[in-house]
């Protein structure tokens, strides 16, 4: 059976940490930021851990 390929879209969006958690960027911080509150854009800054319900699916796409 051939090796499973990594989902290229998922590999660009998700990273695995040293402890095994899967992290992602938060949405809504790419463009049209002019009308969004500074407080909101600060909150959307940085990375966050993937929801527990999605971990299995994302791991499968990353062949982990």
From Swiss-Prot:
Superkingdom field: Bacteria
GO biological process: translation
Cellular component terms (Gene Ontology): cytosolic large ribosomal subunit
Pfam families: Ribosomal_L35p
Key words of the record: Ribonucleoprotein, Ribosomal protein
Tagged with keyword Acetylation: no
GO function terms (MF aspect): structural constituent of ribosome
Gene3D superfamilies linked: 4.10.410.60
Region of interest (Disordered), ranges: 1-20
Keyword Aminoacyl-tRNA synthetase appears in the UniProt entry: no
NCBIfam families: rpmI_bact
Family: Belongs to the bacterial ribosomal protein bL35 family.
Name of the protein: Large ribosomal subunit protein bL35
Species name: Mycolicibacterium gilvum (strain PYR-GCK)
Gene that this polypeptide is encoded by: rpmI
């Amino acid at each position: 059976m051939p090796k499973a390929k990594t989902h290229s879209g998922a590999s660009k969006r998700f990273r695995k940490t040293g402890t095994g958690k899967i992290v992602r960027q938060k949405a809504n911080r790419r463009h049209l930021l002019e009308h969004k509150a500074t407080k909101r854009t600060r909150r959307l800054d940085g990375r966050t851990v993937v929801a527990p319900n999605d971990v299995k699916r994302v791991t499968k796409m990353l062949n982990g």
